[in-house]
Every structure is written in C-alpha cells, then in structure tokens.
C-alpha cells in the first residue's frame, strides 16, 4: 500500500500508517481556526472533490503497474514456497509415527500457524496492492482476518520460544527434561500457547472495523474511502501495540538470545573437552569435529538472526506510527519500512520450515520419500525409527561410538512391555567401531540415556541378550 499523506495532516487529526495487517487512518474534520490554505490540502482551498481528497489522503487506488506486478511476483513466490514447505512438514510428521516426538509436535504447531497466516493474510495483502480502497470484503472478513493474523503471529513466536526452551533443556539440563518427559506435556504446552495466543488477539479482532474518511467541507462520510483498520483513537488510548511489542518481541528475543547463547557455549565447551582427549590421535577427526561445531553454532546464530530480522521491522513500523509521525521524512521512511516489514513478515513463514526442519537430515530423507513415493535407503529401518523411544543428552556434533547400555531395574531382560516407560538406563560405553553407513553429523552421547514414555511403542528384543544398541542418529538442535 502507498503512503502519500502530507505531514500537515497531523494537525487535522488525519494520519495513517500501513502495517502487514491493516491501514490506519483517522477521519478528517476541518476547523476554521486552523486557517489551512491551498498548500495544506494540495487540491485547492477545500475545492477538491471527495475522490481527489481520498486520493490525496490514502494515495492512489492502485499502485503503478510495474510495482504491483513486481510485488505480486515476489509475494507469489513466498506464498508458494511457504505453503509447500509447511505442508510437507505437516504431512511428514503425520505420516511417519517415528516423527511423533515432542520436538516435532512443536514444529507441527509452527507449520500450522504459518500456513494459516499465509492463507488468510498474503492473498489479501497482494490484492491491496492492486485495489487499496474501497474495501470489498466487508466488516466480518476485516475482523476475522485481523484476529487470525495476529493470533497466528503470537502462536509462531510462542512456539519458537517453547521449542528453544526444549532444546536448551535437552542440551544443558537433560535430567530436568527427564523429570518432565512425555508427549502429553508437549501437547499440553502447545494447546496452552494456542489458547493464550487467540485470547491475546481478541482485542485486534474486536477493535478492527471498516473505517471511512470524512469530507472536510460538509463532514459527510466518503463511502469510496472504506478500508479495514483499527481506529487510531483507540490505538492512542489503549497501548495494544506497545504491549504486543514487549510481550511478543522484546521478551521472546531476550529469551532466545540467552537460551541459544547458553547452548552455543555448552556445545563449544563439550567439543573442546573432547578435542583435548583426542589430541595426538587423529588430526582429520579433530578437523571434522571443529567443522561440525562451527556448523551447529552457525545454525544457532541463524535462529536468533532470523527471528530478529523477520519480526523487528513489523514492530518498528507500528511504533513509528505511534511516536514518530512528526519526524522529518516520515512518509518516505514509513513507506520503505512498510515494504520491508511486509516482506520480512511473510518470509518468516517460508524460512521457518528451512531453519527448523529441512536442515535436519531426518526431514530431508522424509521429504525425498514423500516426493518420490518410496522409502529412501535403510534410514527408516535403523536409528530413524527409534528416535521416538529414546532421548539422549547431546553435546557437540561429533562422530561417536555406539553406546552399550543395560537396564538397571531389569538386568536380565530389557522391557518389551509397553507399560515400562520413563526408566533411566545406566550407560556403559565401549570402544566399538562406528558403522560405515552412519551419518557423520551426529551428536555424541554422554552420561545418560532416557527412555521416553510411549505407551504405544514396543521395543524389539535385541540379538544380544540384556543389551540395547542405540545407533547414531541426528537430534534436531
């Protein structure tokens, strides 16, 4: 949408801004005491027609063709990649029981929220570049779109934070995670964050409505100026944007930085300890370990940077509308920031499947299997299918040996009964060769192996009596 309002309209109680959700404007009312002349309205001394007045305040009804086409192509690419990527994540998690883990439940929640926002928000956003006003969808759609868009935004933020805390516990405090282990806990958390998000978005749905401009000469409402908006009077009286900025950006951003910073330090510390033990043994192994450590740290940094880049312009533009309308070059800054915020806002829905899912080898294999219509290799028959039954404390991305463990409560037999869940297994590590087909980008197992509660899983009896061979596999960090 275009921003073409003269700064002097702030004196007329006429101001507006554009956000990825709504266009804000106030009704214009004239006051003889203001003494505005021709330059103030740029359409004669109150002699402009209502149509000219609307065009002056809200900008052209349709953007220039080249700009509308370019934006449509860019947003169309974002829409296709975002919908396809998130759909693949959802289908893979639903189809494969091995993917029914607490971590993947968070990813599923994130994919669903991104899908909803892309479907409800992006098509309308593109349409507004071709037809900014009058609004053609009516008040019900205006309220529903504002409500769902805001709610899905909150769900995405909460899910990323919850997922980050899950990773933090897995890497830095595995014993605490064991005390809270279980799929039901993850489902309860996800359900709660969806409920809280939708409740938090209710004010945006209730306060959004079809707004109109008033013609300054006779104060009549200009029907052709209809647009979906939240009244600026309400925005000025109720700090909805400020609260949203603090709760759904500042606090999550601080938490994410602290959590991933701590995880990065833990990974670096464990890798350095392992390298100290390996000194003088295998230079190639040392180099590979260092490369894997850098890969993980870069990925952790990518999570923080992605969150900041995608969400900060959106909140910044809202704050500029509230507190900086009188600044120099406000209109140019607002228009540029609106384009950047809209692009980054929707790109986050496309980037999330890549950052949180596709970077995992497990997901890449599952995607190939889904697209090709057949299983790829023997990955599903090995460690892939066992991720839902065991959770291991992880350190750096290092090549590790298979771990030989024995159940402390059942020394003669490992549980084949599905009712034996949530038992700690005492680990004994042996220097066993790594299988040739094992993935090199795996996490090393350290002090504890935890069997997660899964009443529907029955572990097969291993060939070696009383023993379990936990194979190398990826753990999503």
Swiss-Prot record:
Signal peptide: none annotated. The chain crosses the membrane at residues 73-93, 110-130, 146-166, 190-210, 238-258, 296-316, 336-356. It is found in: Cell membrane. Glycans are attached at residues 2, 13. Keywords: Cell membrane, Disulfide bond, G-protein coupled receptor, Glycoprotein, Membrane, Receptor, Transducer, Transmembrane, Transmembrane helix. Residues 94-109, 167-189, 259-295, 357-447 are cytoplasmic. Disulfide bonds join 142-228. InterPro entries: GPCR_Rhodpsn (IPR000276), GPCR_Rhodpsn_7TM (IPR017452), NeuromedU_rcpt (IPR005390). One of its GO terms (biological process) is G protein-coupled receptor signaling pathway. The keyword Protease does not apply. One of its GO terms (molecular function) is neuromedin U receptor activity. Residues 1-72, 131-145, 211-237, 317-335 are extracellular. In adults, expression in thorax and/or abdomen. It is a multi-pass membrane protein. GO terms for cellular component: basolateral plasma membrane; membrane; plasma membrane. Belongs to the G-protein coupled receptor 1 family. Acts as a receptor for the neuropeptides CAP-1 and CAP-2, but not CAP-3. Probably a component of signal transduction pathway that leads to Malpighian tubule fluid secretion in response to these ligands. This is Neuropeptides capa receptor. The lineage of its organism: Eukaryota, Metazoa, Ecdysozoa, Arthropoda, Hexapoda.
């Amino acid at each position: 949408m275009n921003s073409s309002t003269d700064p002097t309209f702030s004196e007329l109680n006429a101001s507006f801004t554009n956000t990825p959700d709504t266009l804000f404007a106030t009704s214009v009312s004239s006051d003889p005491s203001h003494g505005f002349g021709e330059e103030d309205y740029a359409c004669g001394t109150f002699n402009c027609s209502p149509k000219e007045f609307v065009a002056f305040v809200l900008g052209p009804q349709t953007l220039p063709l080249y700009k509308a086409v370019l934006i449509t192509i860019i947003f169309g690419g974002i829409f296709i990649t975002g919908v396809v990527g998130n759909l693949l994540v959802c289908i893979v998690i639903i189809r494969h029981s091995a993917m029914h883990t607490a971590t993947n439940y968070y990813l599923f929640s994130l994919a669903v929220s991104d899908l909803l926002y892309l479907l409800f928000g992006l098509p309308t956003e593109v349409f507004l570049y071709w037809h900014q006003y009058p609004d053609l969808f009516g008040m019900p759609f205006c309220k529903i779109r504002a409500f769902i868009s805001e709610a899905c935004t909150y769900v995405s933020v909460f899910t990323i934070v919850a997922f980050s805390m899950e990773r933090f516990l897995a890497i830095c405090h595995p014993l605490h995670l064991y005390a809270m282990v279980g799929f039901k806990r993850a489902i309860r958390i996800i359900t709660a964050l969806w409920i809280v998000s939708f409740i938090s978005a209710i004010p945006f749905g209730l306060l959004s409505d079809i707004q109109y401009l008033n013609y300054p000469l006779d104060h009549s409402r200009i029907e052709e100026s209809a647009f979906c908006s939240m009244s600026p009077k309400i925005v000025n009286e109720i700090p909805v944007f400020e609260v949203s900025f603090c709760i759904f950006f500042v606090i999550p951003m601080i938490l994410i930085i602290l959590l991933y910073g701590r995880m990065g330090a833990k990974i670096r510390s464990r890798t350095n300890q392992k390298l100290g033990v390996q000194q003088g043994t295998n230079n190639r192994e040392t180099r590979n370990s260092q490369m894997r450590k850098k890969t993980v740290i870069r990925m952790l940094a990518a999570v923080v940077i992605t969150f900041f880049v995608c969400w900060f312009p959106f909140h910044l533009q809202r704050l500029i509308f509230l507190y900086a309308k009188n600044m120099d070059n406000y209109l140019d800054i607002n228009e540029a920031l609106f384009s950047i915020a809209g692009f980054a806002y929707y790109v986050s829905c496309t980037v999330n499947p890549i950052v949180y899912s596709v970077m995992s080898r497990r997901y890449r294999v599952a995607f190939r299997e889904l697209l090709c219509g057949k299983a790829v290799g023997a990955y599903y028959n090995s460690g892939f299918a066992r991720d839902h039954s065991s959770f291991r404390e992880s350190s750096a991305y290092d090549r590790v040996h298979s771990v030989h463990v024995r159940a402390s409560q059942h020394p003669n037999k490992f549980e084949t009964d599905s009712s034996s869940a949530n038992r700690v297994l005492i680990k004994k590590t042996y220097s066993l060769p790594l299988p040739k087909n094992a993935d090199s980008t795996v996490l090393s197992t350290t002090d504890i192996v935890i069997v997660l509660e899964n009443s529907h899983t029955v572990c097969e009896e291993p060939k070696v009596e009383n023993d379990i061979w936990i194979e190398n596999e990826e753990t999503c960090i």
